[in-house]
Amino acid sequence: MVKTASGDIRNILATVNGLSSSFKGRCNIVINDREMYVVIRNLLLLWVFSVFPPTEAAEMGLHLWYSAKLPSAMCKRLRESFSEGFKKISLHMAKAPSTPSDTLLSTSFNLGEKGKMHCVLPRAHWTELFSMLDLKMSSQEATQIRHQITMNEARRDYRERHLCLIPASCRASKQQFYEDGLLLPFGADRSEFTEANL
């Protein structure tokens, strides 16, 4: 299967999860996108879904994909997992610091007992990935940046028109999402979500 412009990887996940447990064949999936941050996000999500136990991976992936903040413990585990998993490519880049940014660098990861992910990205993508993992932005800083977009007074009409089009019962939760960016049920405890998302 080839999935170009793979901005949304849900179809890929549904296809792979839909394979029968008795499937013994080989399944090659090629995904790409021209947007660097989409590629990085998809790589991190595929890593999470492959490395962590299914229930934990589902929650981690959901918040990594959609929430503006993460619980401190989750953020720590993700950073450690990504750093360990991508150590080989990081060491390779450190040995050749003058390599041009458009040079393709590849690495492979084992995904459980049967799977393998082969990742080929320009050096610039890897550099950005590592800088994102090293970024230490405060929760307040992240909220301020997010509010400049989601709560911007110039966008008020857009927000209010959107709220008018959704059922009244959904408006308070949508407004809450505009404000805090957490994909949680309305009224759920948000106190653990203290770290800016990667």
Protein language model regions, located:
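Conserved class I S-adenosyl-L-methionine
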Residues: M1-V16, R26-N32
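Class I S-adenosyl-L-methionine-dependent methyltransferase module
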Residues: S20-L198
